[in-house]
Amino acid sequence: MEKFKIIKTIPKICGAFIFLLFFTFLFGHYGELKTQASDEYPGNFKITSHNVYLFSRNIYPNWGQMHRADLIAQADYMKNNDVVILNEAFDTSASHRLLNNLREMYPHQTPVIGRSKHGWDKTEGNYSNFALEDGGVAVVSQWPIVEKSQHIFQRGGGADRLSNKGFAYVKIMKNGKPYHIIGTHTPADDSLISKDTSRAIRAEQMQEIQTFIAKKNIPKDEIIFIGGDLNVNYGTDEYHDMFKLLNVSSPANFNGQMATWDPTTNSMLKESYPKAAPEYLDYIFVENGHARPHSWHNKVLHTKSPQWSVKSWFKTYTYQDFSDHYPVVGFTDNN
């Protein structure tokens, strides 16, 4: 009887031993694979996004656009990125100057969206040859851009109805690995329309971005970044809705100051908006439906420019900022 019990027990012991070996192998190697993914792909990419406030000099002649195009290109925050997303590069001469100044560091560049169909692999959306303004977004890269498309939003709000605003999509190859980047600029609240309408238009535009991603059929093991001036203030109800609309998550950490548009510290805003509260409007997200690094952080860089001056109506104005927005950098623990 005892012999029979021992024989019956042997398969159970063997089964438990085999399970233990499998468990150890699986989770031991999973940990190794997880570390490799973070260290090599996709966890080795750094992006900076900056709204550079290069409005048309025909409308705003006194904001030092040409001079700031030189200062921005020389700024420390522009160095050592994999990719830079530019917003509000509207003025044709100033944006050309900025892009040319950046070309040595970032030889691979898109045109400014909405200015022309030339230089793009594909143009989608509501592009108009009669728009009074382009979309102001461009992407520059250290690494080869193997695909670039521009998409013009179906609907704009307020003054944006006169422009070709939308987003730039690029596929970049870094060391043989693909990285997908969408740079965009959704509309700010506008006195010509209600805040509810502005919010609804931003939501529609974010849905257009997700529709574009779905149609691209990008492999699930490749990473997608979405960045730019989204004009959604941190911590609001709209901020939380944005995660679902774009299918993104909040960065693990927000480092630096908690404002990208701040009249209390920015010399270009103090006179125009002396009573306005600071806002956090610019972000760089990782899309949830595809590859993700182990951690992703956003940091606002409250960096100051060398002093520059302009004259208007016989008065000299001096500033010490690159733009009315501060740049944001997105990075992993490996950067």
Swiss-Prot record:
GO terms for biological process: killing of cells of another organism. Disruption phenotype: A knockout mutant was shown to be weakly hemolytic on sheep blood agar, does not produce the external halo of incomplete hemolysis characteristic of L.ivanovii and does not give the typical shovel-shaped cooperative hemolytic 'CAMP-like' reaction that happens with Rhodococcus equi. Is also much less virulent for mice infected intravenously. Its EC number is 3.1.4.12. Residues 1-28 form the signal peptide. Virulence factor that promotes intracellular proliferation by mediating the disruption of the phagocytic vacuole and the release of bacteria into the host cell cytosol. May act in concert with the phospholipases PlcA and PlcB and the hemolysin hly to mediate efficient escape from the vacuole. Belongs to the neutral sphingomyelinase family. This is Sphingomyelinase C. The lineage of its organism: Bacteria, Bacillati, Bacillota, Bacilli, Bacillales.
